[in-house]
Amino acid sequence: LLAAEAFGIALDRVMFSEPATAMIADGGSTVALRGTLMGGQAILSAANKIKQRMADAVRETLKAQSIDDIAWQNGNVFNRHNPELSLSFQQVCDMTRATGANLSAYGWHVAPNIHWDEEKGCGSPYFTWVYGCQLADVAVDMRTGKITVNNVVATHDVGKVINPVGFSGQVYGGVLQGMIGYGMLEDFNTEHGVVKSENFDTYLLPTIKDMPHIDIIAVENYDKAGPMGAKVIGEPVLELGAAALNNAVSFAIDRPNRTLPLTLEQVRLGYNLKKPERQSEQMLESGDKKQVHRLNTLSLSVPQTLKEALTLMAEKGAMPIAGGTDVLVQARMLSGEVPLVNIAGLAELKEIFDVEGGVSIGSGVCFTDLVKHPLIQQRYPPLATACKTVGSLQLRNRATIGGNIVNAAPCADSMPPLIIYDAEVELRSARGTRRMPVSEFVVGGYRTLLEPDELVVRFILPAPTQQPLINRYLQLGRRNALNITRQSLTGQFMVDKGVVRLCRLVDGALMAKPQRLTEVEQALTGKTLDAATIDYAAGVLHDKVEKAIGGRWSAPYKVPVFIDMFRQMLQEVMTEQKK
């Protein structure tokens, strides 16, 4: 870009061989962008040598007294005082070459002298400085500790902005990494000097969905030490974000904070919680106690029919694979051979159709197709809402509802709505077919009643009641995409003249498995929905949750936050039924 600007030619006419950053001397206040400051000056040095040779060759033709009288713009070289005297850049190159002048040159840049006394801690260690200021506008949910960044203003003095798109990109990336990543998500876990964060299921990086709106302001103070007056932009953006976020959150919650990242727990409790060492979220491990980076132990069978798939599943050790979003991750934890049966192409597992007013959902239906299906949207809105929160668009295009239930993670997003609708699961093997409620099929975290030779073929949801229901689904997660649900609450209510006639509640990512909160339902059913009833039901819920998970490492956060989510849901229902 600097060479193109110097010669006044289009960028596509410049060929650039990018060196390793380490080959370029440190540029001072930024390191990774030293190429702009140090390398840029060297490029201009070489370009000016060549331009002088060109000027000597065409000076008489352009009637120029010196190189200062010559302009280089838009692929032309002309007399700046008499623009009609003009040559194309190619003509200038040809005329210069005809004189025998060399059209190549080395450029050099020697940084100005600096002084730094390490012993006294004084001096000026850099020959140029960048300045910046960032402001964060945030909203904090005091019930959950969830931070929403509404807007960011990033003002940076970078000298002359050479590449506006590149400058903006550096600011966007720096704010996302510094403010959202370092400031909110990247919880690096060490114990006794040993790193426990082994993978990206615990060390969370921000996604594009977490990018806030950013107003970018470039302050262009010309700097004589930089190429064309430019400074640099890079690390300085990163360094401001977390501090701006922390100050904003501290003002919002009226409490100073001196610990990063500002996790949900840190904001809500005032201290962070560390999960005990474990191998992965899937709770799978091999004797090697590690994850492998390459899967070279897989063998894949591709049946053409469901009958053929069931025959293959009868073989010892066979595992089905559809979307692969869980199975492939789990396979990295295993050191032995993993024989897979690919059921992704079986059409009979991808059907959604009406069953006596209810619906049948094939186990191979991906979440994208499930969410957009009109039968699901019209009859079972909480299921559609919950499944929209699964992973990311790419994952929803692959992940299947069958895999989500068979994996049986406590945080499985599709499970609570299926339970609240009394859904049944149909299992099939070469031996026969059986059905059972989803609530009974999952017996605990990552544990089901599925036999080794069985496949989940479909889920059957009964016809929904024709009476008007108030449906609610509340979900809490750390990120806006690629998110593992921290906890959720699914609710169905029928309220008549202020009295709760029907109530169904299912937790998510709270206890060992999602389940109906029957004691709480009983505390609400038949009662007038008012503040006193909510307080009483919240007390019943607190006792149940405390008994179930009170001894866990996460209980100091999960218990009060879940109670607050419950109160929020009932307040919303009470408000809606009054309309």
Language-model features and meaning:
Residues A252, N257, R268-K579:
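C-terminal structural segment of proteins
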Residues L1, Q52, A243-A244, K307, ...:
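Residue-level marker for well-ordered alpha-helical positions
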